[in-house]
Amino acid sequence: MAGYTKRELSIIDTAYRIFIRSVSKVMDAEQIGYIDKAYDLALSKYDGRKTMSGGLYVLSLIEMADIAANEIGLRSKTVVGIFLHRITAVSDVSLDYIKEHFGERIALIVDGYDKISNIQTNNVSFQSEQFRKLYLSLIDDIRVVLIKIIHRLYDMRHKNDVDAKSFKRYLKEVKYLCIPIVHRLGLYELKKELEEKVMIYEYPDEFEDIKRKIRVSSTEQEKLMEGFLEPIRNALDNEHIDYHVKWRTKSIPSIYEKM
């Protein structure tokens, strides 16, 4: 691994160890070993590769793996898929090698990711039913879509890692493909973040204006809700009914959409 400096290897190793400690509570030794194997291959094949902003590409994979395992709650096969999802496209690693060393399911995930990444999106609208059908017809495993969504979430969080032309296309992909899918999967926190990222990049002034107004009016909103809930709580208490009240402010994109 001549492409890394000693300091870079130390940074990567520290980040990976932190990640492994975080997932060792929910994954057994066999699953951790499976992830280690994929990470080692990625570390070797992405030898010294950098992102556009100058960061280490392997660190971006570790962050994506963390999103998968710790933010969404996905398991070892998805994490392995993340470490390997572009490896056949950018290195000499073949699908046969992936199948032999990681199993047929991971090979299908890697192949599926390559297929959806190779769709010529310049010739088809992201909003069209034709595109959605084409996209889904190429997928044999839902984890392919989840890895794509995780990768796009990473891109939205790290705009400087992506060139301007690609980022513009990724925004459309997030808006018309990723967000509807995560909504159907019930991943509402992820949906909220993706919607907010899209609005921040498309309508930054409007986003900040609504955010400011929410902050200014938050105390008044809380008083209003408490006044509304008080008679409901009293009625429930009188009937000795156990309950838990939840309420939330609508997301900024949702507020903007209704303006």
Please describe what each predicted stretch is.
Residues 1-259:
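Active-site helical microenvironments for divalent-metal-assisted chemistry
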